[in-house]
């Protein structure tokens, strides 16, 4: 079943564009590498996870014939790295509550929790910095008629990233943070507000 789906995906990707096919092949190779080996390698696993999410954006853009801007790629890389780290951090918190201070989760030890939280929040805030720099760039001023409105995105995104990490720190994050965001009322409101601002700024 999986080989058939992979073959179908390659055919569809090739029909869309050679770039799309190339990105799909790279994504497949990295996904296999992650499943077989990388997911057990501390730190490399979260970096590759963030990269895979970013490659999805590239694949979607290639499918419609629009190459994503470097602003978007930088923003998504930092944001998804933060989310990958919060997932590992939340796993550590849950394992600690079940097995105590000697517990491990995917190679990470309990003593790694503080470091993961520091790296994760820093990565999330770097995504906000990239967004702020983009808003001040000439590109944003050309694409958005009311680009000043986009400044409201920064505090909202800061709040959401901080909220996600606070939830994880309290041991209430279970599973994928993106799935959590679709169920969390606070995240829903913040995402709706950010989408509304982005649309209004056009």
Protein language model regions, located:
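Multi-pass membrane catalytic core of lipid/isoprenoid biosynthesis enzymes
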Residues: 1-24, 70-81, 117-124, 185-202
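Alpha-helical transmembrane segments of integral membrane proteins, especially early/N-terminal helices
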Residues: 34-50, 77-89, 112-122
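A C-terminal functional module that forms or caps the active site or interfaces directly
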Residues: 126-182
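Intramembrane alpha-helical segments
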Residues: 1-64
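Helix-coil boundary and interhelical linker segments in multi-pass alpha-helical membrane proteins
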Residues: 10-22, 57-75, 132-151, 199-202
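Transmembrane alpha-helical segments that form the membrane-embedded catalytic/substrate-channel core
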Residues: 28-37, 58, 76-97, 126-132, ...
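Small-residue-rich segments of transmembrane alpha-helices in multi-pass membrane proteins
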Residues: 47-63, 78-80, 103-113, 181-193
